[in-house]
Amino acid sequence: MLATTHMLYVLIATCVIPIFGAALSKTVLYQAPDECRWSGGGEHDITLVCHLRTINSELENTNFSVIQPQNTVRLRLECNDALFFQSSLSPDSFRSLVELRDLTIEYCKLGNLTDGSFRGLQELRNLTIRTHNGDWSTMSLEMASNSFVEFRQLERLDLSLNNIWLIPDGMVCPLKSLQHLNASYNKIQDISNFYFSASLSSRKARVCGSTLQSLDLSANKMVSLPTAMLSALGRLTHLNMAKNSMSFLADRAFEGLLSLRVVDLSANRLTSLPPELFAETKQLQEIYLRNNSINVLAPGIFGELAELLVLDLASNELNSQWINAATFVGLKRLMMLDLSANKISRLEAHIFRPLASLQILKLEDNYIDQLPGGIFADLTNLHTLILSRNRISVIEQRTLQGLKNLLVLSLDFNRISRMDQRSLVNCSQLQDLHLNDNKLQAVPEALAHVQLLKTLDVGENMISQIENTSITQLESLYGLRMTENSLTHIRRGVFDRMSSLQILNLSQNKLKSIEAGSLQRNSQLQAIRLDGNQLKSIAGLFTELPNLVWLNISGNRLEKFDYSHIPIGLQWLDVRANRITQLGNYFEIESELSLSTFDASYNLLTEITASSIPNSVEVLYLNDNQISKIQPYTFFKKPNLTRVDLVRNRLTTLEPNALRLSPIAEDREIPEFYIGHNAYECDCNLDWLQKVNRESRTQPQLMDLDQIHCRLAYARGSSHVSLIEAKSDDFLCKYASHCFALCHCCDFQACDCKMECPDRCSCYHDQSWTSNVVDCSRASYEQTLPSHIPMDSTQLYLDGNNFRELQSHAFIGRKRLKVLHLNHSRIEVLHNRTFYGLLELEVLQLQSNQLKALNGNEFQGLDNLQELYLQHNAIATIDTLTFTHLYHLKILRLDHNAITSFAVWNFLPSYLNELRLASNPWTCSCEFIDKLRDYINRHEYVVDKLKMKCDVISGNSTQQMVIYPGSGEPASLPVVQCSQTLPLGLDNNFNYAEQAGGENASNATSTKMILNQPPKLDYIPILVAILTAFIFVMICISLVFIFRQEMRVWCHSRFGVRLFYNAQKDVDKNEREKLFDAFVSYSSKDELFVNEELAPMLEMGEHRYKLCLHQRDFPVGGYLPETIVQAIDSSRRTIMVVSENFIKSEWCRFEFKSAHQSVLRDRRRRLIVIVLGEVPQKELDPDLRLYLKTNTYLQWGDKLFWQKLRFALPDVSSSQRSNVAGQSCHVPINHASYHHHHHVHQQAMPLPHSVHHHQQQFMLPPPPQQPGSFRRQPSLHQQQQQQQQIRGNNNTTQQQQQQQAALLMGGGSVGGPAPQMIPLAGGIQQQSLPLPPNQQPTPASRNLHM
């Protein structure tokens, strides 16, 4: 047993220890320094990447010895390219990395490489040093001749982007295994130091570069290539010397390059080529000479290059004298010839005869005006012929003879006015034909011979109609481009045989009409451009195109638009710059559409609703319209929204639910809305917008909120402010009269809770009626105050009138008044208790009047007054009790009056923040001045103390003296300096009596001054207590009476108790036996509010009510009046959702109105009215006005809306609270008996559908059946499958994207990578040149625009 256990332990140790050791060794082996990380795939393809600031600079020293040498095979060092500090490599820097095979140094600003910089790297195979020293124009990389002496096995050396000026002698000679050398993008002028010349090498007994296979010297400063300069490179296959400044090549510059296959001399300054240049390079396969100035070609210069496949002579100055039959003799294997952008004006008839293998011929951008007959007859393998941008005017019958394998023919940007009918007879394989930008007046009949044609471009011609049948027979045509012609009418049948057509571009024509059904046979169409025409209607054009995903009809004259005009699979739609006034949705199919990008900008839209916008939309442009109203919940249930643009419209206000979104998941970005550049009014309905970006995830992110400016409905200063800078009490609405819902005396003249604006005044309120501003400024009131000043006024402006005097208790009852302006009103007298009852008054402005005295009781009761302005009056006397009870006074202005003496130190509050006393004729009595100065010294809030002066009367003259001089500042007037007897500067004959009053002592007391007078008691304390208690009791009784409804609602919502509720009176005998708790009557346009807000809260809340919704639960086809009567009889309450939509739609229908009136005339107590949004009173029906007066009236958005609604509804039983909403609908409706009526469009359109809230519905007593038919709609899952199938069919390959770009974006041949199709407001643009979204539409450019 013990032996068995021992063996088991040994076995476990044998298995576990190697595994643990391997894991541990791998962890230890692949440890990287702090600045480095390992990257790559397998164990044998791993690279150590180090991100350094610099190497051995003044900032830091770099120690590469910390890198593990045994596992580091590949090392990449990247310095910070933002730091301009020089790096350096010290000798033996990499000596420890003996296994290193690949070393890359990038962005390290090395100035030199010393002899021992790379000592020890004997196994290195690849070395890349790119310092990017070109970032420093004065810094270059200098190398020692022995810098690379260690690299005996180096195969690849990259020294590009180092700003190298000079190569050390024989630098690469020690590199016996070097195969690839890249020294591009430097400043090298002379390559003789490379010792690549056999003659120089033999002279110095050194042979260098014999193993090189590729040499890249492009983008340097070489000006010439002498004879045999590269003759030692016998194995060289690729030579790149492009982008230099070479203007001279020696006759035998390529001597010794026997293995050369590819030579690139593009972008130099060559004007000619030596005749013997290619004498020893007979293996050449590719020659690139484009972008030079070659104007001479020696005859037969290419004659011995039998292996040549590619010859690129584009962008030179060759003319017809040097491009002739002798030029291409011997090039029997040439496959691509590029002669574009030269000066060729004519071609010999047999010029291309030696080129039997030619496949691609480019002759664009020359001066060719005619093509000899049969010129291409020997090019039987040619598949691409580019003749764009020449001067060809006619294509004759034999011009294209022999091109039986031609696939692409580009003749665009010529002067072609005629093509022979048989000119394309021999081009039967042609697939892409470009004839745009010519002078064709009709579609060429020659097209009848190219039945395999896939793309045809005849844009930018003068074609006015499609008459011949040549184009109608192109059954394989994939894309047709006819933009910028003169087409005026498209008749039905023109495109019928083009069954493969997927892209159609008819933009920028003069089309006024397209016959309905013209495209019904082209079911494969995916993209259509009709922008820039004169179409007035698109009805019947696109409904039969199930695969259409892209449609541009902008810049036309459309006045009507309906979603029934487009297929449900359309994903991108542009209708901007038309005359559309409404986004119609007659069949209510917004939930079935697939639109993701929709541009309806620059139209005449005035209103948008939820049905105006498809539910699938992601990007929506509605800018530059005339939109003045956005219906509530317009953007609700649009889950894919990412951006909405509403700038430059006519919006003046937005209610909170106008931008309401469905709740957004936390992992999704909130949609971005742009709503700026509208004439907003900062009224009471817009205060919510200021903080919308701080709301929950049911409101969008307003990206331009800080740029929104609005006009204040009421402003006593600037009327335009930035929205985010507006104060909360700036958001006001104007009103003439208003009566609160709980006010019961509105029909009587004397009604305190009725807000009625006085004559000649303007009145404003905020959303919650917290602010109530009454402005009667300069209203020409004489002697008396305006009548009926609202009791709830918070700001009252009466300035600029003529009142003379204000009676006692003039403002009694205005207990909420905070600001009162009475300035500039010629007031002479304030009676006692003038402002009594203004318990909340904070600001009182009485300046610039004619007050002469304050007798003590004028401001009694203003316990909360904070600011009192009395300047610029004629006040001479002030009673000592005037200000003593103003405990919260902060600002008091008494300047510019007639006060001579007032003991401010005894009778002013000590908690002031600002006091002004200047410009009064203060007495210079030393007793007064000493106390006044002491008061000023102790209180900093006397802000005008330096301006205070007193008057000294001496004889017939009055002298002013400074009371409180500034420190260190000379006074312009003498300063009062009191001694024990006289003020300083006055003689002993000065009469103090004269100082007080006049010329003699008898007048000395003429100015009234009451000092230290004992306070008067106006009321007996007991009487005050009794009166206070009585007032308190009366206020409590009044509050209970006024707010009795709120109290009942609160008690019901909190405790379930109904106060003052007579069960015998309020409950019908059979009420509890009724099937439903409430029948909800509403407009179909408000269905979203009912289904998403009202019904879920009532049916699924704590008290689960059973509701009957007519849009959901009524049998389709039933007789509506009788059905409504039965629904109301079966319900304990009737909820009527009154909105502008309800008034303009359902209530105006005779049957609906009659049914409601007949049932509700005697049952008004059972009716609950919910007002949704603003309902214009003038448009209300008289019956509705009566309903609103006599029934429970709830405003959506009220803070206690749900509590009041539940209070108005009957109580539900406890058993019902636990039931699931809707389970009382026992009898399911027989859907087979449904009947549905529509005036169907001439094309069959899918009927709208909605997802039912309940799976079961109740059955009302059967109404009279109407004949008709009902078509059950597909489920949501089926719709998603259909949309996915449509999207799947629209997937295109890269080749199709190339064709789309050419057909939709511009004319010309297709070359290079396909531009990506990017849907923007202006159409699909090239990704490299995107247009700004929603720019003013302009005619499409020929190349960049679609």
UniProtKB/Swiss-Prot annotation:
Ranges for region Disordered: 1235-1346
Pfam family for this entry, one: TIR_2
Membrane topology label: Single-pass type I membrane protein
LRR repeats: 97-120, 124-146, 151-174, 176-198, 209-232, 234-256, 257-280, 282-304, 306-330, 331-354, 355-378, 380-402, 404-426, 427-450, 452-473, 474-497, 498-521, 523-544, 546-568, 570-591, 593-614, 615-637, 638-661, 790-813, 814-837, 838-861, 863-885, 887-909, 912-938
GO cellular component, one term: plasma membrane
GO process annotations (BP): axis elongation; convergent extension; innate immune response; peripheral nervous system neuron development; regulation of protein glycosylation; signal transduction
Bilayer-crossing regions: 1022-1042
Described purpose of this protein according to its UniProt entry: Toll-related receptor. Probably specific to larval innate immunity. Involved in the tracheal immune response of larvae to Gram-negative and perhaps Gram-positive bacteria; upon infection it negatively regulates the immune deficiency (Imd) signaling cascade specifically in the respiratory epithelium to prevent the overexpression of antimicrobial peptides (AMP). Involved in the NF-kappa-B-dependent apoptosis of unfit cells during cell competition. Involved in neuron-specific glycosylation.
Family the UniProt entry places it in: Belongs to the Toll-like receptor family.
Protein name per Swiss-Prot or TrEMBL: Toll-like receptor Tollo
Species this protein is from: Drosophila melanogaster (Fruit fly)
Underlying gene: Tollo
